[in-house]
């Protein structure tokens, strides 16, 4: 028997953040904002200079995090954010920097 599936108002955000976002505290800042919003997931540096952010929780909180990522008030400088949406992964806990 499996547990209940994700609630309808829950979502999983996958955001690819382009710009000068490595070595400037961007992942730490993202983690702090995600935890304030009650989200789980991770922020990971990629070899090409992007940061991959995966966050899940309420759709509203994920949308707020996406808005913050695009706000211009992050560490470093964000040129663009490409976002994709999916069903949440029930096994994800906490929010980590990778």
Curated annotation (Swiss-Prot):
Active-site residues, record numbering mapped to chain: 27, 45
Enzyme class of the recorded protein, top EC level: hydrolase
Record-given protein name: Acylphosphatase
Catalytic function, reaction form: an acyl phosphate + H2O = a carboxylate + phosphate + H(+)
Domain named Acylphosphatase-like: residues: 12-98
Gene from which the chain derives: acyP
NCBIfam families: PRK14422.1 (NF010997)
Similarity comment: Belongs to the acylphosphatase family.
One Gene Ontology MF term: acylphosphatase activity
InterPro entries given in the database record: Acylphosphatase, Acylphosphatase-like_dom, Acylphosphatase-like_dom_sf, Acylphosphatase_CS
Sequence intervals crossing the membrane: none
Any Pfam family the entry gives: Acylphosphatase
Native source organism of the sequence: Mycolicibacterium smegmatis (strain ATCC 700084 / mc(2)155)
EC number, UniProt record: 3.6.1.7
Record keywords: Hydrolase
């Amino acid at each position: 028997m499996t547990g209940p599936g994700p609630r309808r108002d829950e979502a999983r955000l996958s955001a690819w953040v382009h710009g000068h976002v490595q070595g400037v505290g961007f992942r730490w800042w993202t983690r702090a904002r995600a935890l304030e919003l009650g989200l789980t997931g991770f922020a990971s540096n990629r070899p090409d200079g992007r940061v991959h952010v995966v966050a899940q929780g309420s759709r509203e909180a994920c949308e707020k995090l996406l808005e913050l990522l695009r706000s211009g008030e992050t560490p470093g400088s964000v040129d663009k954010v490409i976002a994709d949406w999916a069903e949440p992964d029930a096994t994800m806990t906490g929010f980590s920097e990778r």
